[in-house]
């Protein structure tokens, strides 16, 4: 392929697909993968199912673009995480190295080497990273300094938010006409007497608005849309009415099926219909009649009447009991009727809430503006601010927008299903309208809590499917990860569960997983999926297993441990090939306890934010609080009770009785002082042993308090560690490595706190307490994870990963639906819906009542609530899909249930091969969904076995123990012929030693060397030429230097050298380099201010302005290559073995007939000849590498010396 070769036509792609299909390759690309790699000329959406090779497609597409002459820095490539970007860059780099090694075309080699250099500057990363870069370069359009910082600490954000909220709140309260505002605050305060509840409402609205493309526009134009639109029965959307009618029919269907069950008494012994059956038949008839003829009987205007009649028709309870089992037949319908039943009254009072919402709208806008102003003053912003700045710049500056659109050949985005509207707007502005390449899978959109909107993907999917002229839709269905047992059960579950109404996409042939290779299609019956249910029937009442909470039980974990032991012992499955997936990071202690009991190594994925709540850190924080203020009773007692001093409850009680007066309450420290002086009320309670401990404690605390006045926090913390051996003590406790890492991090964080300009123990404690007040924490310190252990991680964390065996735990846990009861519910299209507290006193006509407050769900709230409910259930469905598709070989679903109840479960209604919508909406756990599917479609093979596990199956004998196959049993030693074996071993070792000696030089020869390592090899040769080489080891003359008490950090020469090289690399090359260009490049250098101050900018300016080499670089900057990596094969003279020399060349100019090589040096020197001699061999090596690469014999070599008193450019080949 030539680098100027055009892109493939559809006909050429078709031929390539046919050739690939007929080829004898072991791993063939699918036709859809080929289409995704080579299609061009229009927007492309790739719907890539789990394990379909989307990363492979992206890498191959990028490489194809590069090979066709599109430089990698002309591609915009967005990834969801920094880690994904790093992995993508590594794959591209590997592909480029392979291409360089395989080609013999020198021109192509040079071009691909250029691409390797350009890769580090290419826009491959997260949207946040790109937005920062754009605002850094063009923030001047909005008046933003390029030296802004990102507020990444949530605690810092919350502290600033609280301060801004307080100021805005006081402004609104101080207004003369504040009646509506006070009523607004009271509406959300409930029983609280402060403004905290209202502040939470404002926070949630602000956060939601930030995910939109234009927050201020959304707040001004959309925020009140629903409140102004839905004010009467006629405004109720058709889909809401349709959902109610469908629920009525579904309830009638379920009731009809229930009356046909064995055990339901339809007739009496006399043969007459039972009263219950007659009543149920009437219900069935009425439900069918009213639903079928809704328009003629009621219509929207009489919806309230229908709700009243349904309430009268249905029983008060939701269940019907048949043969001792309860069936919640009426639950779904009754839940829907709650809002409709009183809708007429709600609509009458709802209009009162609109003035309050207008005040709320104004307040949130004021808060948003004030919060942004506060951040502008600090020149510190959140990620969302930077993204909005980037959008604003591109919208306000057409020249900048057009420059980006003209620069990018293609705008590529990975994990497109997890984009929010802010990110989508930024991508639209960067694209020219027909050069977008989007890869994702709506079935794996699980980040709604980050305001991701899967409908962005879904709308494009539908548009491109219906209108190919708008863009190309490519489906990647083949899965190359999982065996057929995993694929089959996944398809069986989701084809009966997921559709457009719930799941937001229909799981049909377009989305079902297909095995991508013949090996995957081979059947392994032992890997058939299993639903393992711990039977709660046998659990004793009051025990954990009998509880109805959502926590995982010890029984569930024990059955998992039993299966893992079986896999390890019998199938030789390594622990690291097994992963446990849970829904959240917390409340997993039972898993660790049970696994520890059976000796199964387990490692949890990091990321928990409970650092400040770890025991060892809490002890240290209470110690610091006590040093700061001994009158803090809680902290002081906690310190005394801690392992550092080990006062027990009895001793603390004796001290607490030592008040000097019963009239005035005293702090515990005062009682401690009274105890020491013998002046308490009961001095006889303080024995000699306790007195000794008190004296030791008091002396130590006083010593620490005095030390804290004169020393840093870092030194104080380490003094506490050393004085009481606390750092050593935690090393003997469980999770010792983590505990010590946490304590060490506390000292480091305290030091960073003081380094940032804040001083003093009091301020540090205040900062920590503010973090805890805002319900925030700091991330746990990461420690090295054991390699051979079972993994425990959340489903969210597992996305994109794959494991041989997957256990999805707590399968019966109910979905978190708390958001459906929140005071407000926000919708991107309809705005806000609220619970309004209305005074309904006049409805009762009781003059004795001052007021009667009733909280009612307004119609916009109810509509937003229904949409949120569907969105939440849809995301849970996708979460299950992600979890199941992580497995390569086998998936286990683990929960708990009553065997008796499950076996008596009847089939749910189904429609078009799926569970009925009402059933799917009613069921609120993964387990409920799956059991409904198995009951409803029991006659079909669902590729999963349901198995109950009793306590009798989980005894210590039944579970078993891990067997180690590596231990040598004593019985195996009796026939051991030691003398003969040892002699044979010694003989073998002797032969190996002789062989090693004969090839000693080759063994010691490194495979890869750097030029600086080679320089030491040349030193003996340089010595023979009259150059003195200092004998090793070199001993410096002893001298006494005064200690440096300054706070300035020492700047190492190596730091200056590295920063200079980075500066010379960052200077934008042009025909005329100005001082401004150099100053701008200096700002981009990633070094401390102290290091930058040591850079001699005058010499850099003089280099380009006065030297011939500097002028040559500017004149021919198109031929300039900087920071160029190279590799050359050399032969060792002693061993005659080959080795690779690798390095980085500062720069060179490439002409047709010559190469101009140069290198910057910051070494101190007296005579330039010293450095010429020192670096001659290194430069010769660079020249040899360039000459071999380009086939050009003439290479001019220059050293640019910046370490002397004057700038000097010397040529080495003269």
Curated annotation (Swiss-Prot):
Its cofactor is Mg(2+). Residues 512-800 form the UvrD-like helicase C-terminal domain. Belongs to the helicase family. AddA subfamily. The gene is addA. Residues 27-483 form the UvrD-like helicase ATP-binding domain. NCBIfam families: addA_Gpos (TIGR02785). It comes from Streptococcus equi subsp. zooepidemicus (strain MGCS10565). Keywords: ATP-binding, DNA damage, DNA repair, DNA-binding, Exonuclease, Helicase, Hydrolase, Isomerase, Nuclease, Nucleotide-binding. GO terms for biological process: double-strand break repair via homologous recombination. InterPro entries: AddA, DNA_helicase_UvrD-like_C, DNA_helicase_UvrD/REP, P-loop_NTPase, PDDEXK-like_dom_sf, PDDEXK_AddAB-type, Restrct_endonuc-II-like, UvrD-like_ATP-bd. Heterodimer of AddA and AddB/RexB. The heterodimer acts as both an ATP-dependent DNA helicase and an ATP-dependent, dual-direction single-stranded exonuclease. Recognizes the chi site generating a DNA molecule suitable for the initiation of homologous recombination. The AddA nuclease domain is required for chi fragment generation; this subunit has the helicase and 3' -> 5' nuclease activities. It comes from the Bacteria. This is ATP-dependent helicase/nuclease subunit A. It catalyses: Couples ATP hydrolysis with the unwinding of duplex DNA by translocating in the 3'-5' direction; ATP + H2O = ADP + phosphate + H(+).
